[in-house]
């Protein structure tokens, strides 16, 4: 059993390396098998039915915020002062890894050219994070911690407040030249966000 888990992890590590260097289109099952030092590419299919499934699993294991929202039930009743910084840290810490930065840049370019890549990434990452935030906001409204509002918009608004910080790591370093640290940014944005949604007396 341990050997099976090790082999699976070996494949995921190799796939992450290949996807971050070559993107989804450039990485092949054969090249991933070679990087993983497998005797045959067909061994990958023992663990993953196709390249898309392997890519989804790489995203699952390499994006911290997805691990955070994997078990949403444990978070829904916690106060927003605690949960929103957790989500923000998970999102922003993704881009501290140079390989993850490369993969994100490649995925953005590929998603613009290939709708199927946009769909995979959208369903695996964006839809799940926004879906969690929407459910969380709705629960906080029920608990009286946030005023009634359209949780679809607040979920998008919260993530939107983090995009410049992520963009400074990925594409525009100039944003970070005189900018706050991640902790300073998430503290300020969470405060602004929650002040705007606090219950009205």
Name each model feature, range by range.
Residues 10, 18-53, 57:
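Helix-turn-helix
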Residues 56-87:
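Amphipathic alpha-helical linker/stalk segments
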Residues 82, 93, 97, 101-102, ...:
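Amphipathic alpha-helical packing segments from all-alpha helical-bundle domains
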Residues 119, 137-191, 200-201:
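Hydrophobic/aromatic-rich alpha-helical bundle segments in the mid-to-C-terminal region
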Residues 1-6, 201:
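N-terminal intrinsically disordered/low-complexity leader segments
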Residues 51, 58, 62, 87, ...:
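Hydrophobic/aromatic residues within well-ordered alpha-helical segments
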Residues 7-16, 32, 58-62, 66, ...:
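Generic hydrophobic, amphipathic alpha-helix propensity
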Residues 61-69, 98, 114, 136, ...:
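A short secondary-structure junction motif
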